[in-house]
Structures are given as C-alpha cells and as structure tokens.
C-alpha cells in the first residue's frame, strides 16, 4: 500500500490528531521565531565546514553554540574539539528536542544541549562562540559578548555581522551563494576598559 493509501485509510479521529500535531509543531516554531526573530535554520554543509575550520581544534574551555537549531553543528563542534566543552542553547521546543536526541545518539560526552534563551545566560567563560542568527539578534548579542567574553575569545558568525565590531577575518563561501563567515576576536582593550574604575 502506498503512503497516500495509508493516509487515506486513517479514521477521522486519527486524521484530526495528526493534523493537530502538525499544526502544534508548526505553531511552536512560528511563535518562537516571531519571539526571537531567528528561525531554526541549519547551516549548509559548506558553510558549516568553513565555520568549523575557524574554530581551533585544540580549543580548551567552553564553546558556546548560540541558537543550536536541530543540533547538527553542535555535534560537529564537539567532535572537532574533544578537549572543549560544547554548550548549545536552543529556545524553540521542537528543534531543542531533536538536538537533545542527537546529543544522546552522538554519545559526545563533551556536548550539552540546553533549553533556554542565551541572552539571559552568562557567557563569560566562553573561549569560542558560534552563531547563525539574524540581524536583530546580532544587534542585541554584540554588547553582551563585548561585556562578558574574556580577552582573546573568538566569535564565528554565519552570514551576519556583529555591529560596531570589526571582524578579524572574513571568509566567503563561494560554494554557497558567496555566504560570508565572520571571525571576531575579543580585544584585550575591551576587558581592560570594563575593569578600569571610573573617577
């Protein structure tokens, strides 16, 4: 029997439950997207590979993946940097559940997928931050990273810039629509300025 035949054989109650579940899933993603301004879109394989190459494989400490989506990139980060602790944040319920399942299936001991808004979480122990966010989220994130990240920390961003923060390097992924990947480094001066008493 074909898939269409299987669907046609469902009772009215089963069809209603299936459609209700589908609407709930789509609604959940839509509500979270409207709330955060960031849909759960995965990075393409070419862009993800470029981002990974900008993260030192010998990174120690914490790597934050902000807006983990479905979790695929977070797993790759954990595989690439076994000496690091990868903490991935996701706020959309369904992608979070999938990412959490992927964490379990990958058996990466150095990966932790967390449900929550990274804007309300401290990031001051981050050695590296990776993100694929939209413009509005980057505007809100930039001052938080400036204020919290230790000197020398790296930020790797897919496609979107951090306002008023010149990148150390920009890599254009020609294999996918000339997508830019930005590498930022937290300058020592920013930390010194925040630690210097005024008056």
What is each stretch, according to the model?
Residues 59-69:
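Conserved class I S-adenosyl-L-methionine
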Residues 71-75:
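Glycine-rich SAM-binding Motif I of class I
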Residues 107-118:
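Conserved SAM-binding strand-loop segment of SAM-dependent methyltransferases
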Residues 137-198:
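C-terminal substrate-binding/active-site "lid" region of AdoMet-derived donor-dependent transferases
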Residues 124-140:
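A short SAM/SAH-binding and catalytic strip from SAM-dependent methyltransferases
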Residues 85-90:
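Conserved SAM-binding motif I beta-strand of class I
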Residues 1-58:
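S-adenosyl-L-methionine
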Residues 99-100:
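Conserved SAM-binding loop
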